[in-house]
């Protein structure tokens, strides 16, 4: 189906965090809000219509994901990433940050080290610190306007700090890097060597363009 991506919808004054934040903080309202992953085009009409039917029912009780939900998810990953995942592998969470925090608590103990690569989506450091784990940063290198992984530093930080868990952002937010297969393989090799568990946030995996192709960490 065709979709009009050029339609402009004014979201100011609608309790929209993305646009109202500037006014609420006494800043110029013309500031471009590039700090949050919030789309500026309306939801698909089919989705809005389905939600409308649900709200018309008038009861907002507990619900559960049924088979069509799982089949859509499994089909998407097989079609776009050639990965045949199993329904039993899936765990529903309220959101990606909650999932990251749950992983930190499940796979590490207070006082243990968790690795990240800054600059990175700010909740990464929050879920580590808020759960009393130690933040270890292996910063990305900016080379000729292009961010790269410093693998020597990456391995040294893991070894010197006895890192237990690595939070990977793939594709990387905010630098926009779509990691290549060989980069993910090298990450995997190092982490396996030192027994480091990798938690990969791939929420932006569907948003690549041109010759960039997202590679799943699991299948690399």
Name these PLM-found stretches.
Residues 33, 115-116, 199:
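A structural signal for short, well-ordered beta-strand segments and their strand-loop junctions
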Residues 218-219:
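Conserved small/polar residues in nucleotide/adenosyl-binding loops
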Residues 133, 193-196:
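A short helix->loop->beta-strand "cap" motif at the edges of active sites that frequently abuts
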